[in-house]
Each structure stands twice: as structure tokens, then as C-alpha cells.
UniProtKB/Swiss-Prot annotation:
Active site: 115 (pros-phosphohistidine intermediate)
Database matches in InterPro entries: NDK-like_dom, NDK-like_dom_sf, Nucleoside_diP_kinase, Nucleoside_diP_kinase_AS
Gene name, Swiss-Prot/TrEMBL: NDK1
Organism per entry: Arabidopsis thaliana (Mouse-ear cress)
Name of the protein this chain belongs to: Nucleoside diphosphate kinase 1
Keywords: Acetylation, ATP-binding, Cytoplasm, Kinase, Magnesium, Metal-binding, Nucleotide metabolism, Nucleotide-binding, Nucleus, Peroxisome, Stress response, Transferase
Length: 149
């Protein structure tokens, strides 16, 4: 089953949106396979966003991620990467549809509440970085109610 990495950024944590984010993924039918609240070290944030290191906003992005705790999660389910991105909304909240996390809770691109893997390959890399011991091995009892066998 496909997995994705989702991170509630410091603004989402500070604003008390952790439960709301988890609720949206659970209500969709996805299974939480890993969860931790963590204060991110600068070098770790730089590694996570290394593909953006040449961008002018990189330093500010790293400053933002280390400014407070984040919630790192692994979610599992059919097409969870693509569907997770739809639940999250566009990177720029101004372009996010109402009903998405960013459409409902974010205004500024620099404080857009949440990160989600943009591909299956990115998800694998991010999960390996944030959860080196891997996900929790369990299956939800609602699995048969979400997926056809």
C-alpha cells in the first residue's frame, strides 16, 4: 500500500490545527502509520529541503521550519500521495480551493500550515529521513470498510 509523508509546520502546530489535519486524513480513510512531535534542528531542515537550496527563499524556509515544533506523520492508503496533495491544497494558499487544508486555514505562502510529499519517490525519501526505524506495522480494522477486496 502506498505511503506519504505529511508534516504540520510550526504555524499549524501553534494554531492548534493538529487534530483538524489528522481528522481530515482519517475521515478520508487513510491509516496513520507514524506520528511524532519534533523540534527540528537546522541541519535536518536543510537536508529535508535540500532540493530547494538554490532558491532565494531557502534560508527563510529553514528559519520558519526550525522556529517551533512540527508534527511529522506517515499516512498509508490507495493513491495517498496524490489524494493527500488534494486534501492539502495548492502550495500558495491564495490558489487553494475552499475545503482544502490550505484553502481553509492559510493565507500566506510563507505560512502555509502543512507539507506533503509531491511524489511516491519523495515520500520514500522523506519517510526514510524522518522515520529511520520505519512506520508502525499495523492494519486498521476499518480497512475492509474503505477498500474493496
Amino acid at each position: 500500500m502506498e505511503q506519504t509523508f505529511i508534516m504540520i509546520k510550526p504555524d499549524g502546530v501553534q494554531r492548534g490545527l493538529i487534530g483538524e489535519v489528522i481528522c481530515r486524513f482519517e475521515k478520508k480513510g487513510f491509516t496513520l502509520k507514524g506520528l511524532k512531535l519534533i523540534s527540528v534542528e537546522r541541519s535536518f531542515a536543510e537536508k529535508h529541503y535540500e532540493d530547494l537550496s538554490s532558491k532565494s527563499f531557502f534560508s527563510g524556509l529553514v528559519d520558519y521550519i526550525v522556529s517551533g515544533p512540527v508534527v511529522a506523520m506517515i499516512w498509508e492508503g490507495k493513491n495517498v500521495v496524490l489524494t493527500g496533495r488534494k486534501i492539502i491544497g495548492a502550495t500558495n494558499p491564495a490558489a487553494s480551493e475552499p475545503g482544502t487544508i490550505r484553502g481553509d486555514f492559510a493565507i500566506d505562502i510563507g505560512r502555509n500550515v502543512i507539507h506533503g510529499s509531491d511524489s511516491v519517490e519523495s515520500a520514500r525519501k522523506e519517510i526514510a529521513l524522518w522515520f529511520p526505524d520505519g512506520p508502525v506495522n499495523w492494519q486498521s480494522s476499518v480497512h475492509p470498510w474503505v477498500y474493496e477486496t
